[in-house]
Amino acid sequence: SSAASDVYKRQAINSACKGIKSVGLCHSVQGTAEMLAKDLNEKIEDIDYLCAGINHMAFYKKFTKKNGNGGEDLYPKLKKLADDIVSDKITSTRSIGKDSESDKVLHEKVRYEILKRFGYFVTESSEHFAEYVPWFIKQNRQDLIDQYKIPIEEYIDRCENNIKLWDDLEKDMTPIHNQPLKRGKDYASYIMDAVTNNNEVTINGNVMNDGYIDNLPSNCCVEVPCLINSNGNQPQKTGRLPEHLAALMRTNINVQILTAEAALTNKKEHIYHAAMLDPLTGANLSIDEIYAMVDRLI
């Protein structure tokens, strides 16, 4: 299933292989925080947040503006923004112009709808998050896809454009000659700096759930704040998630655990089980159709 995050599968397999130190990385937490800051016309430097969950389905338990007095809760403003974005009165700042990789306008109605219904903002983009739940992409429901402005096959366009970019660079590297080096926003360089030079940093990393989120399974991979320094990676306990958020995550955790189980045990039947339990797949296909789809894929 396209919905099951690959980060969990890799972490589960790594945890089964003793002696491998690893942390799963994704840029959706910091990227979404920056988008929300822009949508609120705030500076990201003034934002403080606490985000926890699973990869591509983590939620901001706290999203505040620093003010020296405990912080201003920005969720009331975000919820007002959600009403305006879902009703097409305004768009997210992410939707201004076409995406540089897929060449499509990427709307954020899905995530703001989720904020309205669940009360918290999720980390993964609308076009991808719609693949994790059964409510937005349905066969013979073009009206829903149009309503939420979901760019179907956007990732295929993104990959094709990136492949063309790499092919062009292979033929001619002059466009990137003398290109200035600039540190990106992904975590890897900050982790190396923290471990090597003890320049302490907190990231959101993916680790097996060793008590870090109380109401998610212990054999799942969670995305939580991680303190990194010369002592290595120290994931932080975040307590319990709101039960409705944990319930939503478990629908995808089921798929992730079974997919990893198939790889670890070499039992093909668990791939069918994972596909049958995938929320979007189950909302669109019968059991026979799911089995046939899996057979075509493998």
Can you annotate each of these PLM segments?
Residues 18-33:
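Acidic, His- and aromatic-enriched active-site or binding-groove loops in soluble protein domains
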Residues 5, 27-28, 52-54:
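An acidic- and aromatic-residue-enriched active-site/binding cleft used to recognize and process polar
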Residues 10, 33, 294:
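Generic structural marker for isolated residues within well-ordered, non-membrane alpha-helices
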